[in-house]
Design a protein with these regions (language model features):
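An anion/pyrophosphate-binding glycine-rich loop and adjacent beta-alpha core
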Residues: 1-80, 87, 167, 171, ...
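Internal hydrophobic alpha-helix adjacent to the cofactor/substrate pocket in enzyme cavities
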Residues: 14, 137-160
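A generic secondary-structure signal for well-formed alpha-helical elements
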Residues: 19, 89, 145-153, 174
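A glycine-rich dinucleotide-binding beta-alpha-beta segment and adjacent secondary-structure elements
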Residues: 53, 59, 65-129, 159-172, ...
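Acidic/polar loop patches that form or flank catalytic/metal-binding clefts of enzymes
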Residues: 90-93, 153-160, 216-220
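Glycine-rich phosphate/pyrophosphate-binding beta-alpha loops
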Residues: 127-135, 191-193
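Hydrophobic, well-ordered secondary-structure elements that form the walls
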Residues: 141, 185, 308
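Extended, charge-enriched "interface" segments that sit outside catalytic cores
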Residues: 189, 195, 206-211, 215-347
Length: 347
C-alpha cells in the first residue's frame, strides 16, 4: 500500500482541462464505488492523500496494477504523477489508464430468464443490462446461456429466486427495479442473507447444477456423502446429553452459566459463548468422531444448522411466504385499465 500526496494532486490537476470526464465528453455515471483519482481529488478536496493498493498482475510478470489510481488524464500527466508516488519513483508504464462509456438497455425489458420481452430467443447478459464487475457479468452469462439452451430444447426455464442464490437477487433487482447507475452486487442487497451463506453454497446449488448437466456425478456423490454425515451429526447432537461434571469446567472457562443436570448438546451449542471447539472436547463427541470420521466442512455445517436453527427456520418461513405470492403470475396481456380499484396514476 502507498499513498498519493499534495504534490501528486497538483500534477494531476494540470491535466483536468484535457480530461474527457471534465470536458463533458463522457457524461455517463461511473461505478459508485470505483471513482477515478481526479474525481476523488475534486470530491474530497480536504484530503491531502488517497490510498493506492499495489497489486501484482501475476506470478511471472513484473507488471503491477495501481488500484485506486484509475484515470482518463493525458498519458504524460499520468506518468509524471505516478513517479511522485512513494515507491514509484522509477516506475515504467505499460498501459496508461483510460475511461470508457458504454450504452445499456434498461433491464426491466427482460424476463427472469434474461430473454428480452420483445424479441423471442434474444438473451442479454453483462454490461448491456447495466451491471459492472466480472462476477456480475459471469453469472448473467451463465444464466442466459442455460436458459437459451433450455429454450432451444423446449424445456422449462431455469430461474433462481432471491432465497436460493445471489444470482437470483441480482437478476430480480435488475428486471423489477431497473438501474440508473452501474449495478454491482453486494450481500447487503439480499434480504435472506442467513440462507445465502458461503458455507452452504454447495448444498443450495449442486443438485440444480447436476440436473442441468453442469455438474458431474462424482461431485454430486461427494455432496451426498457430506449431507449424510451432516444428518448423522445432527441426530447425534440431538440425542446426546452432557453431564455437569464434564461440561461445567468448560462452561465456566467461557463465562457461561453451569448446568445442574444432564442437558442435550444441542441446547448447550445454542449458547452464544459456545463454539464447536468447546463441544469437541467431550468424550462422547470424540468417540463419535473416532467411529464416524472427521469431515471439517460437514461438522461446521451441522454446528451452524444447530446453533442458528431458530433464525434459519424463521427466514425460510419468510422466504416461502414471499415465494408463494411471487408464484401467482399476472398474464402479460392483463388489462390493468379495466380494474376500477386502481387509481388513474397506477393505470
Amino acid at each position: 500500500i502507498t499513498y498519493t500526496s499534495d504534490e501528486v494532486h497538483d500534477i494531476l490537476r494540470t491535466g483536468f482541462e484535457k480530461s474527457p470526464m471534465f470536458q463533458g465528453r463522457i457524461q455517463g455515471l461511473g461505478p459508485r464505488y470505483c471513482p477515478s483519482i481526479e474525481d476523488k481529488i475534486t470530491r474530497f478536496a480536504d484530503k491531502n492523500r488517497h490510498q493506492i493498493f499495489v497489486e501484482p498482475e501475476g506470478w511471472e510478470t513484473c507488471e503491477i496494477y495501481v488500484n485506486g489510481f484509475s484515470t482518463s488524464l493525458p498519458e504524460e500527466v499520468q506518468m509524471e504523477a505516478l513517479r511522485k508516488v512513494p515507491g514509484f519513483e522509477n516506475a515504467k508504464m505499460f498501459r496508461p489508464g483510460y475511461a470508457i462509456e458504454y450504452d445499456f438497455f434498461q433491464p426491466t425489458q427482460l424476463k427472469h430468464t434474461l430473454e428480452t420481452k420483445l424479441v423471442k430467443g434474444l438473451y442479454f447478459a453483462g454490461q448491456i443490462n447495466g451491471t459492472t464487475g466480472y462476477e456480475e457479468a459471469g453469472c448473467q452469462g451463465l444464466m442466459a446461456g442455460i436458459n437459451a439452451c433450455l429454450s432451444s430444447q423446449n424445456k422449462e426455464p431455469f430461474i433462481l429466486n432471491r432465497s436460493e442464490a445471489y444470482i437470483g437477487v441480482l437478476i430480480d433487482d435488475l428486471i423489477t427495479k431497473g438501474t440508473d447507475e452501474p449495478y454491482r452486487m453486494f450481500t447487503s442487497r439480499a434480504e435472506y442473507r442467513i440462507l445465502l451463506r458461503q458455507d452452504n453454497a454447495d448444498i443450495r446449488l449442486t443438485q440444480k447444477g447436476y440436473d442441468l448437466g453442469l455438474v458431474k456425478q462424482d461431485r454430486l456423490d461427494r455432496l451426498n456423502e457430506k449431507l449424510s454425515y451432516i444428518e448423522k451429526l445432527i441426530a447425534f447432537f440431538n440425542t446426546t446429553s452432557a453431564i455437569p461434571e464434564e461440561i461445567n469446567p468448560i462452561l465456566e472457562s467461557l463465562n457461561s452459566s453451569k448446568i445442574s443436570q444432564k442437558t442435550k448438546l444441542t441446547k448447550i451449542m445454542s449458547r452464544p459463548q459456545i463454539s464447536y471447539g468447546s463441544i469437541e472436547k467431550l468424550i462422547s463427541v470424540q468417540e463419535f468422531l473416532k467411529e464416524n470420521g472427521t469431515d471439517t466442512e460437514a461438522i461446521e455445517q451441522a454446528f451452524i444448522q444447530i446453533k442458528y436453527s431458530g433464525y434459519i427456520s424463521r427466514e425460510k418461513d419468510n422466504a416461502e411466504k414471499i415465494t408463494r405470492l411471487e408464484n401467482i403470475s399476472i398474464p402479460e396481456d392483463f388489462e390493468y385499465t379495466k380494474l376500477a380499484s386502481l387509481s388513474s396514476e397506477a393505470k
